[in-house]
């Protein structure tokens, strides 16, 4: 019998990102109660030796499963000590993998308050707009002009601790170009 391989997308992440993700998920499941219905499975409850945890997030009749791994092959850099995360959408027998931005958007649609459809009309009429958007990570890219106007109109209240973002968990912060603050040009290279 031949070996059969199954390929999945696993985002390489830093071990500290995974620890932060676990603590945020547990806080919002057990303390703030904003993540009602979420299910956390620790490493010892999994039969797979490389799975360090699973978070099952119900989305209607589907489920989003965020699985973190350890003991994978190391990456190109020393800090990539074989830790990774995969994000899977499950509905009955159908399964597919999703990107972190889409996962955040789906979580936002099902769990956290955002501006209602009538908020734009209320803002134009000068009425009080509520609720405010709690989960900023669910709005990927720039957002619509109406959303940006509402965001300016209604001051957002920062939640402590922040809500768990799958995009931030899978973000590659080492390969991004660094931003330099306050230096418009190099003073030694401007010809003077």
UniProtKB/Swiss-Prot annotation:
Motif range (BC-box-like motif): 144-153
Region ranges (Membrane association): 171-172
Main localization is host cell
Compartments where found: Host cytoplasm; Host cell membrane; Virion
Q: Name one GO molecular function term.
A: metal ion binding
Recite the UniProt keywords alphabetically. Answer: AIDS, Host cell membrane, Host cytoplasm, Host membrane, Host-virus interaction, Membrane, Metal-binding, Phosphoprotein, RNA-binding, Ubl conjugation, Ubl conjugation pathway, Virion, Zinc
Where is the segment annotated Interaction with host APOBEC3F? Answer: 14-17, 74-79
Residues of the region (Multimerization) are 151-164
Q: What is its membrane topology?
A: Peripheral membrane protein
Motif range for HCCH motif? 108-139
Q: Which residues get modified to Phosphothreonine?
A: 96, 155, 188
Q: Where does Zn(2+) bind?
A: 108, 114, 133, 139
Per the record, which residues fall in region Interaction with host APOBEC3F and APOBEC3G? 54-72
Protein family per UniProt: Belongs to the primate lentivirus group Vif protein family.
* Designated name of the protein: Virion infectivity factor
């Amino acid at each position: 019998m031949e070996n059969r391989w199954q390929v999945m997308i696993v985002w390489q992440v830093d071990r500290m990102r995974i620890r932060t993700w676990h603590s945020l998920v547990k806080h919002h499941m057990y303390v703030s109660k904003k993540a009602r219905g979420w299910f956390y499975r620790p490493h010892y409850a999994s039969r797979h030796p490389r799975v360090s945890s699973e978070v099952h997030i119900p989305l209607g009749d589907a489920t989003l499963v965020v699985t973190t791994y350890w003991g994978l092959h190391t990456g190109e850099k020393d800090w990539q000590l074989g830790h990774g995360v995969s994000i899977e959408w499950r509905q009955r027998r159908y399964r597919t993998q999703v990107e972190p931005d889409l996962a955040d958007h789906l979580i936002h649609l099902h769990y956290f308050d955002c501006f209602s459809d009538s908020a734009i009309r209320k803002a134009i009429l000068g009425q009080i707009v509520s609720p405010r958007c709690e989960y900023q990570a669910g709005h990927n890219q720039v957002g619509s002009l109406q959303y940006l106007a509402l965001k300016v109109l209604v001051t957002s209240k920062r939640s402590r601790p922040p809500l768990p973002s799958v995009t931030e968990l899978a973000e590659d912060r080492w390969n991004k170009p660094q931003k330099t603050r306050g230096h418009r040009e190099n003073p030694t290279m401007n010809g003077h």
